[in-house]
């Protein structure tokens, strides 16, 4: 016959086993029963280069990949994101997950007003946006809040000023063509897994360079991108399309340095294990300006 203490111990053990079983069922239920809210996607592009082409008519682009695990790049990306995320529009957005973002700013349409948008790669997960009204535009659902809007069923998802968002929908749907010139430059960039990138076009690109004796714009396209090399260290690409007789030349600014030219488009590929050196590295350039020689006729007899 079992003693009272043994009976009590058996009951406690049975209770513990029952709790473990219930806990296992709950864990299984949460793992298998919960799914991230998803959305329908009507138009979609994948890959950085194809995404950049959709906003190739903008004047300034930033690309930030939040999936990088490199601490140096994470710090650089966080610094840019901290600045961008101060925008008032983020009062109206809530994400379930974000892989990367492209920020595109367009030339001003009036004094002090620059249309802009954020493209968020969220896969098929849902983005929550506080809105006052909703409308259909070329088969895409637009949610509107004052001067801000979100194109919901596209990927990357677009959030920004309404005019910029509608321009993006026009492009991703094929209604509007991309900027062929800048899209062609983007196509020629080395196919790396960029984690951070900056693109400037038109006058925004030309403002970063000044040369004595030059007349008119020097460049109309600037790209700078950084990637983590699989074998260690970092790769950096800088590309510029020159409007005058300017070109990249050989240099030893990094451990590895190479220049490729496609007509006036100059591309410098750099590699180094020193992150600070990679971040600050710029290609060396040469300029050739031909000046007319004034003819000295002297005195005629």
Enumerate the predicted regions with their spans.
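Hydrophobic, Leu/Ile/Phe/Ala-enriched alpha-helical segments that form helix-helix packing faces
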Residues: 80-84, 215, 253
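Surface-exposed flexible segments
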Residues: 126-137, 163-174, 241-256
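Secondary-structure transition/turn motif
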Residues: 122-123, 145-147, 161-164, 239-244, ...
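Secretory targeting signatures
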Residues: 1-39, 157, 301
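Structural boundary/hinge residues at secondary-structure and domain interfaces
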Residues: 28-131, 136, 187-205, 260-301
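An internal, short helix-loop-strand segment that often contains or flanks glycine-aspartate motifs
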Residues: 41-55, 61-63, 87-94, 137-236, ...
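C-terminal interaction module
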Residues: 219-270, 275
